[in-house]
Amino acid sequence: ATQSVDRALRGYMSWEQLRELQAAGFGIGSQTHSHPHMHRLSVAKNRDELTVSNERFLTELGMRPSLFAYPYGEYSIDVINEVKQAGFIAAFGQHSGIAHGYDGFFELPRFAMNEQYGSRDRLELAINGLPLKVNQIVPEDVVLAENPPSYGFTLSGDMDQERQLRCFNSRYGKLDVAILGRRAEIR
């Protein structure tokens, strides 16, 4: 978040440090100006967050990042559209998973590797993971209005493990999954 860099907040890199990384060939990505919960903001406010951030990168580094990470990993269809309009070529959520050809470039998964989830075992799990290739996900928008939601997806043609599929909820444990051919619906 460029605001944190501008304010020289403790624990954040400075513009000078970012320039050093850039000069050494590292890629620099973006995450808005003030790091808000974007799905809660209006389209105009999100556009402003992205514009201000891009302007700060242009001023300080002479470039606009092409990659974006949603603050807190949160996004909606409206947020994705604004990120695309701002000129980014891809964006990352904060949901664990393996990217594959069925993922949209603006909903890429990433494994968190931090003090809580940064063990060697976790790194090995992430490196050796395989994608769950799905499409036709319902609901399309990850910001849900209905609780509990109706949720379903179709396994890609090269996935043949539908009978082994298990889904879990952090509060309720294992969920009932109805398998209808290649379609899975959580009920």
Residue map of PLM features:
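Acidic, His- and aromatic-enriched active-site or binding-groove loops in soluble protein domains
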Residues: 88-97
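Terminal accessory/targeting
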Residues: 1-13, 35, 112-187
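Metal-dependent polysaccharide deacetylase catalytic core of the NodB/CE4 family, i.e.
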Residues: 1-79, 89, 102-109
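Short histidine
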Residues: 97, 103-107, 116-117
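Residues that line or immediately flank small-molecule/substrate-binding pockets and catalytic motifs
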Residues: 72, 95, 112-115
